[in-house]
Amino acid sequence: METDGGGWTVFQRRQDGKVDFYRGWEDYVNGFGHFNTEFWLGNDKLYKLTSRGQYELRVNLEDFNGDKAYAKYSNFYIGDKSTNYKLTVNGYSGTAGDSLKRHNDHAFTTKDKDNDTHSSVNCAKNYKGAWWYYTCHASNLNGLCLCLKLLNKTKNKCNVCCFKQYRYFARPYAFNFKRSKLWVFKPAECPQGHQM
């Protein structure tokens, strides 16, 4: 596990597209990637971590212009394997908008294990990444990031690696991201004045 002082644990990082996030169930259960570059910690580890008391979540985002935003949630928990790692998240604050609200109380879906509530498609297959989908998403930070060159010709492809509530400057790609980092911490363990 990667920690950053006083109880912070990073469980997802994307920054350069060198690690493939379009993977199956077992990879997401066990984790993959490299802690010093891009990785997913693993749903089993995330469940074990968040089951030890109240945890908060912070989502750090950076778009293709270098603009940054964050979302913070005062309550974050992942269920165990029997719940398909169901997400519990609430208590939003921040600058990125609440793009996880609609994902609350939904199970984790991968390309080979369809747990979303969409009746006709597997959202993970459709959007090329595993996530806590409903029908299908308001955020998808494990999706295929295709917006590096701002694909103006294929708008729909720019709707994959995203946090949809983050809109500003009326740009069509304002909610698509080059970098993301998901952190959890136990409030009692976070030192006063700790900055991320």
Where are these regions (language model features)?
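Mature extracellular or lumenal effector domains of secreted proteins
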Residues: 1-196
